[in-house]
Amino acid sequence: VPQGSLREAVCYPNIDPHHPELAQALTLCRLEKLIDKLDEVGNWQQTLSPGELQRVAFARILLGKPKLILLDEATSALDEPTEAALYRLLRRQLPHSIIVSIGHRGTLAEFHDKSMYIARAGCAA
């Protein structure tokens, strides 16, 4: 997360800082308490908790609307109900996006159509 305003941090690297859906994305990602702080300048990497940083990443996804979403341990700092809510949110808001996740929790399987498990000896689809 770059230093500067929270608005710049949420919109990093290439989202319009005045995106009309910015407040809505934060609210959907359970970060509504940050809306009033968008123009505050600070070291947000240190100010926000690991879970908040992960939810900021989900807000970026909602704003950027990518066709391909790659998530590597993207919910490791979140509890399982919040993880489930965010994955459901992505599926609902971005139904045509491809989501590829890497994670250790078995709870991620329900949000994906296909799974691949990697073991020491190799992988199994």
Which residues fall in each region the model found?
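Catalytic Walker B motif of ABC-type/P-loop ATPase nucleotide-binding domains
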Residues: 69-73
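Conserved signature/switch motifs of ABC ATPase nucleotide-binding domains
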Residues: 64, 95
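Conserved catalytic segment of ABC-fold P-loop ATPases
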Residues: 98, 110-118
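ABC ATPase nucleotide-binding domain helical subdomain, centered on the C-loop/LSGGQ "ABC signature"
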Residues: 7-43, 87-88, 96
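Conserved H-loop
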Residues: 96-104
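Helix N-cap at the start of a conserved alpha-helix in ABC-type nucleotide-binding domains
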Residues: 80-81
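ABC-fold ATPase nucleotide-binding domain signature/coupling loops
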Residues: 2, 29-56, 60, 121
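Short active-site loops of ABC-family nucleotide-binding domains
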Residues: 76-77
